[in-house]
Amino acid sequence: MKKVFLLLCLLATTTIATATDLWEGTHAVDWSNTLTIEAAKFADAQVGQKIVVEFKDATGEVIELHSNGGMLPGTRYAHFLYADQHEMEVFITPGMLACLKEHGMEICGKGFTATKVWYGDGKDNVDGNTVWTGYFWMDEWSTLEVAKTSFDGINWSDYKAIRFYSEANRTDYVINVLTKWGDGGKLGDQTTMTMTNEYAELSLEGIDMAARLDTDRLMVQCNKEGGNPFNFTAIVLVKKEVDTGVRDLTARHTSTASKNFNLAGQRVVNPGKGFYIVDGRKCFFK
């Protein structure tokens, strides 16, 4: 009886990883020899799961994931594969999933041989406002380039900000948000954005995003400055709210899921009386 009870406990607390194979073989990818995976293969795919492309013989050239004649939403614009790498992964956003289920996926690029493609367990915190998520290492002037298609179909009048999430757990790093290099390309930096230990937030007030995204990508450049390198993890749109101004809250009415920061950008677990940033909004706790 004890053995049966122990087995039931193990089953109840163990997470079983799942994977769905999409394709397996040997395919030398070139711009004139792409690998196509039909839409039907993604029938059971879900937001937050990861798609993994396994490969060999990489030579430092680019890989691009396409759908319906353009870059797959939620993917990097410039993603290079090197000899010491054997797989790349992308995490499914809502925009990506819609494209996959309607049009499938095409693996493009050059200088590598695809051997397997599958999808499976990934992240569990990807919501409907996420346009890119993954893990991108920010060190010295590292630049994440996200395909413009990640923003397809967005009505910018519904949104007030873009949040750039990371694992930096500090605010003393450099961040530049750009649509192109050179004059007129910068949307904001650490001096104009709201910086917290969890994310940097770019206000869209006064920015015509539809017009500014007249290029093929959105770029996020970071320099670690005096701290350690860190992972960049998500780009999330923040919707406008019906009400405005400072909220008057008490601690007992604050959701335990909310993350509270003081005005210096430091995380506060048990906030006392005063002003705080709660889920991106300035609030007063009694």
How does the language model describe each region?
Residues 273-277:
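Extracellular disulfide-bonded cysteine-rich modules/repeats
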Residues 1-4, 286:
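Positively charged n-region of N-terminal signal peptides that target proteins for export
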Residues 15-19:
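Sec/Tat signal peptide C-region and signal peptidase I cleavage site
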Residues 278-286:
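C-terminal tail/sorting-segment detector
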Residues 4-13:
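Sec-dependent N-terminal signal peptides
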Residues 240-264:
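Residue-level detector of functionally pivotal "anchor" positions at catalytic/ligand-binding pockets or at interdomain
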Residues 20-99, 108-239:
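Extracellular ligand-binding interfaces
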